[in-house]
Amino acid sequence: MRGIAKSIVLILLILAGTLAYFLYPPEPRAVTFPGGKRFAFSIVDDTDMATLERVKPLYELLHRYGFRTTKTVWVLESNEPSHPPNRGDTLQDPAYRAFILDLKKRGFEIALHGVRGGSSQRQDIIDGLKEFNGILGEYPKIHINHSLNRDNVYWGELRWSFAPFQWGYGLIGKHKFFGQDSASAHFWGDLVKQHVRYVNQFTYGDINLLTINPSMPYRLSDKPYVNYWFPTADGDNLDWFDELLRPENLDRLEREGGVCLVYTHMGAGSFNKDGGPHPRFEARLKDLASRNGWFAPASEILDYLREQPGWTPDLSFREEVRLEILFLWNAILRGLLPAPIHS
């Protein structure tokens, strides 16, 4: 029994040492922002379930407080509307299209969430990208994979680079994704490489993404169709958004000279109340706007970070594993902990 106990202790010590090695924080990166600003902030708004009625008041509020953020859109109508996250307005709707064009005119960034809510084959993707370009005058700089779309690039088990995580997800994951598979009817990896600059990979619970990934944005050698990946901070719904941007976190973001790109679903309903923006949403924006922050679209911030001294886009193996462990840990916490409770 003593021999077994010693073996268990030894294994635990080895595991602890290995975990400590991968989780040891990388060298911090100091960044100076335009105009003497103390930190950078944006929102990356996922278009799931977004309707003109819900999102227009929210963006009016963002504009009023001086924010320029990133909003994803769908070009084509959903072909799988029975899946709730696939529902929402698209650029096929004239009023919604006019609203999106007005946002772009005001300085907001329009990004892609796949060409539709639902899986698309290559010709539809080509047509959707051309229509995006025709309407907005440019191709999207940012793409965000959507839910169960089979045309997602490097999604599911291929979202991971560390082999044990990839294998583990492959065993439990029920869905496959083919956007990077040149033999698939859903392939468009070459178009991502040609037209899209940034793709979101993982989301974290930390407000300052530079502490998670100092070299953001980054490249991954095993995912060649994506030019650059970037992390986001978890503000999925109003409760998590409110929790992430509480005053003490904003104090820290400002103190550390950090970067926060909040990933959220502004059109899903939680940000609205009585036909307008929820008061808690406005309170967080008001606090943010009172601080010396650089409020710019996500791709503008990422472009700027690439130009700063000390940027190293190619992650080491250790950094890759660290990002994946931290993402897994955040996902576990989100699953185990109750949502924040607010009055």
Report the location of each language-model feature:
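Surface-exposed cleft-lining segments at the edges of enzyme active sites
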Residues: Y225-L238, M266-K273
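Catalytic alpha-helical scaffold of carbohydrate-active enzymes acting on polysaccharides/glycoconjugates
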Residues: R2-I11, G17-K223, F241-V262, F271-S343
